[in-house]
Amino acid sequence: MEKVLRDYRSRLQANSRETERIKMYIRIIAFLRLSVVVVAALIVYLFRNEGVEVWGTTVLIGIVLFLSLARVHDRWFRKKEFVDCRDRIIHRELSLLEYRFDGIDGGSEFIDPSHDYSFDLDLFGERSFFSYINRTATAVGRVALSRELLHPDLKTASIRERQEAVEEKSCHTDFRIDFQSYGGCSGESRVDTEAIERLAGMPRFGTGRIVCWLVYAVPAVYLALFALWLTGMVAGNVIVAVFILLLVLSGLFAKRVTRIQEQLNRTLQSLSRYSRLFEMMERMRFRCKPLSELQSRCVDSDGSVSQRVSRLRHLLSNLDQRYNFVGFALLNGFLLWDLRQINALDRWLCDNCEKITQWIDVLSRFDVYVSLGTFRYNYPDYVFPDIREDRTPVMQAEALGHPLIPREKRVCNDVAPMNEASFQIITGANMAGKSTFLRTIGINYLLGCMGAPVCADSMTFTPLPLFTGLRASDSLADNESYFFAELKRLQQIVLRLRRGEKLFIILDEILRGTNSVDKQTGSLALIRQLVGAGATGIIATHDLALGKLADSLPGKVSNYRFEAAIQGDELTFSYRLQPGIAENMNACFLMKKMGIIPSDYSENN
């Protein structure tokens, strides 16, 4: 960890030096631009009586120099934008390594209380696991990462391939930071893939064959007219008339062009900004299969994706010139600019529209690997779990910890082998660590399914669908009580098991909404049914009677506990998992200490 922190701090210092260098060049170029204006104005003033050849040439040279310097100035400003983005990226890494989540995106729109596990494991929201792991550079990558968290591919071969890709991307630190920085420079606009797919089926919006022919004939017409004018065969008024005629023709199409431009900007503007990201993907050399396959999808017989997306960006930028009134008049009067660009965009879409969805899929998948590669790099002591297919075990780990708990506060525990059709029952006092332990298992199991490293010394697991029941809530909108909401989740588990699914189940204090006897009877019956259906999992409870199942279901149910120690007036927790059934409870002790009940209260009072 210290090595990683030193690396980021070193990069931050180097980036600061580069920022200062770029600022210096920007100031120099600004001074040169001003100097060109001042010198040109001075020469014009001093030689104003020398004839139009002298001061006219000076003005022309001054304009060329000024515009050239403006282009150079713009490039340096883009470089500064890039290094500023890189500065923010590195600062974000340092903040997250120190578990500071202020201002970090939590993906709140992905929160779904009905999902199999995401709500229980706090995957999304403020200070969530998504905040911790998300390093995506694009809006489409961000959505793809949420899909990976919610619906990971559980095929063993796929997980192993993802592990290879994550490991390889963890070695490309410069690439990852630059990729994220260019993504940050491209903006956060959402790429509407559904709208893009609809573009493929929309009618062509080109201007027709006659107007298209006219667009390409206009430059030749003007050249001929200018040549005739220079020889005195045509009056200048003819050229002016043609200019006005073409301007009127452009005006007739202006409303249609504006409508098409707005539609294309909504659907394609974000994609056009990603040309540099595609270029980075295409130029890198990859060893592992997943990254190589993604890269191969960026090139075909028609050229590379980056070239075609760059062409799109160029066309959209050209069309934006129409918003300048002078530019609109000159460009359309001489070149029928709007119609020329609309026809070019129509041809571009005709050639590429059906491929855009594939490009976005490639970019989003690659972005997820960059994100997980950063996670791997940031935590070099995390390990890739071993994957089993025979469910022996479904889950086992040594020194398993919760990645969202800082290292100095984290207490790691071993997880005994959980084989098929077996359950571990965790008993313990309030605040002893049961719920945190369940979430620790859930988060690391999910990381393993995603192909990411886990917070453990070692871990072995069989990828199965994960289902949790750690929290439930009343729903006034659905006229649903807490207890009924919990029953519905338990019903989902049972129905899926009856359909033959194999699940990894994590439950916390089931049937909390009923009386003790009813709860105990229902809990015992549920665990027997889950074991009988071949499910595997872990259940935390305060009900010590559930521990007796280990006697009636030997080899199928095992007991573990978190203990609280009461020494005099102090309550302490070790947060260490131990075999057996809990012996100490702390509710009355805490109620006495907080003055809720009398300090001399006892059950005999």
Predicted segments with their positions:
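Alpha-helical coupling/stalk and coiled-coil linker elements that connect catalytic or binding modules
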Residues: 1-429, 436-466, 488-489
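ATPase nucleotide-binding head domains, primarily ABC-like/P-loop NTPase cores
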Residues: 70, 372, 379-605
